[in-house]
């Protein structure tokens, strides 16, 4: 059952279940809403790199962090079209693109709309991650055919000030509301391993699950600790705790795609398998995610083959009582 009235007590109870009980519960929910041996495969391109004015502690592209990243200006339409075509050729179904800036500028809206149209012409779903978005901008992107907009909450409201101070939590929620009001599917999740507590993870999922409409996609990232960022020495999130979060996300948002996003490059096959069993059913494909390494295509092909999991487009997975 899809709910928007979860409580913190209920959420913490899920996190506190014995591991096997939690995974069993999540897996049964997953089977109710999705075909359980299928995953959605997405690609992610960086259309503008570095120099972002936000001070996100985890980000290699923040102008506040000394990571040595080379800046790159806004891509051309043909560059985006070529990247989308290459992604389609290797089996990707959704092409996502992101820009390192605080918000979408009005002067760039037309160019972004051209990106969306180019991606759609290749027969792919489109997703943009461009920072804060005004309602009228969201409406223009919807008219251009944008399918998804990504804007993560990153962590809980209570812990957020430890991670970002140049953008408020409410500003993030305002953008999500604008995207939903424009009729675009929301992609919204967070990052694990930034020093947050289990309650912070619960609060983050609670925020997402109690939106007026659940995000269509929920990316769960494992922190990639870049040298030169305030979080470069952060301790890696425990694997069992990561899988727990995947499972709780699946239970609380049963019809959403739960995506394994950044931080997969050092995940074992066994950890991937547990995540898929717990309800993860979407991955990013390709060796690079913005500025972070990703699992190689060869690793993913071998992994999915060994597990008997197949890559299928969005919508093909759904409503399977099996």
From Swiss-Prot:
EC number: 2.8.1.6
Pathway: Cofactor biosynthesis; biotin biosynthesis; biotin from 7,8-diaminononanoate: step 2/2
Single GO MF annotation: iron ion binding
Domain of life: Bacteria
GO biological process, one term: biotin biosynthetic process
Cofactor list: [4Fe-4S] cluster; [2Fe-2S] cluster
Chain positions recorded as [4Fe-4S] cluster binding sites: 52, 56, 59
Domain Radical SAM core: 37-264
Catalytic activity of the protein: (4R,5S)-dethiobiotin + (sulfur carrier)-SH + 2 reduced [2Fe-2S]-[ferredoxin] + 2 S-adenosyl-L-methionine = (sulfur carrier)-H + biotin + 2 5'-deoxyadenosine + 2 L-methionine + 2 oxidized [2Fe-2S]-[ferredoxin]
Sites where the protein binds [2Fe-2S] cluster: 96, 127, 187, 259
Record keywords, A-Z: 2Fe-2S, 4Fe-4S, Biotin biosynthesis, Iron, Iron-sulfur, Metal-binding, S-adenosyl-L-methionine, Transferase
InterPro entries in the cross-refs: Aldolase_TIM, BATS_dom, Biotin_synth/BioAB, Biotin_synthase, Elp3/MiaA/NifB-like_rSAM, rSAM
Cofactor note: Binds 1 [4Fe-4S] cluster. The cluster is coordinated with 3 cysteines and an exchangeable S-adenosyl-L-methionine. Binds 1 [2Fe-2S] cluster. The cluster is coordinated with 3 cysteines and 1 arginine.
Family matches, as Pfam families: BATS (PF06968), Radical_SAM (PF04055)
Family label: Belongs to the radical SAM superfamily. Biotin synthase family.
Quaternary structure annotation from Swiss-Prot or TrEMBL: Homodimer.
Function of the protein: Catalyzes the conversion of dethiobiotin (DTB) to biotin by the insertion of a sulfur atom into dethiobiotin via a radical-based mechanism.
Name of the featured protein: Biotin synthase
């Amino acid at each position: 059952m899809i709910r928007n009235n979860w409580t913190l007590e209920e959420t913490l109870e899920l996190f506190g279940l014995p591991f096997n009980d939690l995974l069993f519960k999540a897996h049964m929910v997953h089977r109710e809403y999705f075909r359980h041996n299928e995953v959605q495969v997405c690609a992610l391109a960086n259309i503008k790199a570095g120099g972002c004015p936000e001070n996100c502690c985890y980000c290699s592209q923040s102008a506040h962090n000394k990571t040595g990243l080379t800046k790159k200006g806004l891509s051309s339409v043909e560059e985006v079209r070529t990247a989308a075509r290459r992604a389609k050729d290797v089996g990707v179904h959704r092409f996502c693109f992101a820009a390192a800036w605080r918000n979408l500028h009005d002067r760039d809206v037309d160019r972004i709309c051209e990106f969306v149209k180019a991606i759609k012409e290749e027969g792919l779903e489109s997703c943009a991650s461009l920072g804060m978005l005004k309602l009228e901008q969201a409406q223009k992107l919807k008219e251009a055919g944008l399918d998804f907009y990504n804007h993560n909450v990153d962590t809980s409201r209570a812990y957020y000030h430890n991670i970002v101070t140049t953008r408020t939590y409410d500003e993030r929620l305002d953008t999500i509301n604008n995207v939903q009001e424009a009729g675009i599917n929301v992609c919204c999740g967070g990052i694990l391993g930034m020093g947050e507590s289990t309650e912070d993870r619960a609060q983050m999922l609670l925020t997402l699950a109690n939106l007026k409409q659940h995000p269509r996609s929920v990316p769960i990232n494992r922190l990639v600790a870049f040298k030169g960022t305030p979080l470069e020495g952060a301790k890696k999130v425990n694997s069992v705790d990561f899988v727990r979060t995947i499972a709780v996300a699946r239970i609380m948002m049963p019809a959403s795609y739960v995506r394994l996003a950044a931080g997969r490059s050092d995940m074992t096959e066994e950890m991937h398998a547990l995540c898929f069993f717990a309800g993860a059913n979407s991955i990013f494909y390709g060796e690079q995610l913005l500025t972070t390494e990703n699992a190689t295509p060869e690793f993913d092909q071998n992994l999915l083959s060994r597990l008997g999991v197949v890559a299928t487009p969005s919508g093909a997975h759904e409503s399977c009582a099996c």
